[in-house]
């Protein structure tokens, strides 16, 4: 009898301990198990369609190679000894805010290596912090991937999915194709982050509801093996087919030519190396790191006729523009402080501005595209302003 009572007491004691332990564990993690309805919200979308301003201008800020890590604890690279102690990712954030306040862009184009994957333990958190100033100011933005973004906790598909769902983003995972039986489906295409952004004419103008400016974004890949050799990625044939198909779709019948277009991607094409032997504007300070494959990008741009310039990153201490067969290829210049650079060479950003032509009583299509850079110095110095394209033609039938 005494033995039975002892066993019963032990059982009650064990059960009490187990219940207490479970209650303790639940108290520690309950905030993670319950939905906080106050934090559930929809993506804040930009005002679409994007369009030119009342003054007939549209301005794009290109941000190349932020290489963002984990904020304050991620130190700068290649800065002066006197700057190093207090230099971190926050310097990159501060520079982005300065550029936004100075230029007031209509769109920000993040052209890859937005985060430096190996320097963060949480890719999503790093992206939120890196892109944060664009969201704070409510500015529409678009992003493509570089060759370092995916080296952390998210793969390339997951990264583009996340980027497309962030506030004020116009980024897309890949282009959609209309299917009468299935609805919109994603086109089978190489990479993640191939998409088109249309810009409409100025409010109240005859082209207010028409595409007058096309912006094409591409995934230029990561690393690949070609004939046993390791090389960088490149824009593939499927992407170029999509570009050609898309560029002829959906333009207003009021415009007698395809609107001018720009392209944005991370890794330069092979032909950019040839610019060393030509006049260029800016600085050509390092070799062009690109694929050994001649991708057909230049030939496609030339055959289309309306792609006026392409903007890229990847080689941080190159910031030049040069022209190949009538198409400009421009580096953004290294933006981020955790990216490699040169101690006496200021981080920088590129600005692109398009201006509409003025008819007798209305804004017409684009008349001029120009670009310049700003340095992250005391004065946010403006350098290397140049015209990329200009026309005297009328755009209307």
From Swiss-Prot:
Glycosylation site positions: 91, 209
Coiled-coil stretches: none
GO molecular function: acid phosphatase activity; metal ion binding
Protein name per the record: Probable inactive purple acid phosphatase 28
UniProt subcellular location: Secreted
Natural source organism: Arabidopsis thaliana (Mouse-ear cress)
Pfam name, any one: Metallophos
Homology family: Belongs to the metallophosphoesterase superfamily. Purple acid phosphatase family.
Domain of life (superkingdom): Eukaryota
Subunit structure: Homodimer.
Cofactor details (free text): Binds 1 Fe cation per subunit. Binds 1 zinc ion per subunit.
Annotated binding of substrate, by residue: 314-316
Cofactor entry: Fe cation; Zn(2+)
A GO-annotated cellular component: extracellular region
Signal peptide coordinates: 1-30
InterPro entries assigned: Calcineurin-like_PHP_ApaH, Metallo-depent_PP-like, PAP14/16/28/29
Binding site for Zn(2+): 266, 314
Tissues of expression: Expressed in roots, stems, leaves, flowers and siliques.
